[in-house]
Amino acid sequence: MPTVQLVLVRHAEAADGSLFGDDSQRELTQRGQREAAFLCRTRRMMSVPTPDVVFTSGYERAEQTLERALEGLSLRIVRDINFSPEGSYRKAWEMILDESRRPLKEEDRLKCIWVVGHNPNIERLLSLVSPEVSAVLRPFRKASLAWLKLRDVESHH
């Protein structure tokens, strides 16, 4: 199995849930918008690779974070309930594994997969793929990014 770069991002600060009847519709606060814009600057400054695919929940706060963090890029986005707060991180991981197996058109570079999602599942995914990094980054705060290079993706179960 080839090496894959995995970037895990927790959405930026969102409006209080009591203001919305539907949790999936919560939007970023002004602070959250600044945090997501900072993620974009950080991505560029650190040369975090452009994703081949982005997995996300489709929840408004994750979508807004994704749009600002990856501003100006043409992206393949997969929206799935397993990347939501109520989703199954194990099923989400299987989707990531399936994507990691898909061949790239340019064989001379590493595949890069981004996940823009929610806790507790972002923390669970991080713990699954790198318990050491997870221990350092716990709690995985809003508008945080973890950039991992996974040499043997299949071994992370």
Regions found by a protein language model. Name each.
Residues 2-83, 87, 136, 140-143:
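Active-site-proximal alpha-helix that buttresses catalytic centers in soluble enzyme cores
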Residues 84-100:
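Short phosphate-binding loop-to-helix
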Residues 133-157:
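Domain-level recognition of soluble alpha/beta enzyme cores
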Residues 107-128:
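A glycine-rich beta-strand to alpha-helix segment
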Residues 46-49, 99-111:
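Glycine-rich phosphate-binding loop signature in dinucleotide/nucleotide-binding domains
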Residues 75-80, 93, 105-106:
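Long, internal stretches of domain cores in catalytic or enzyme-like folds
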Residues 65-69, 92, 125-126:
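Hydrophobic packing residues within well-ordered alpha-helices of enzyme cores
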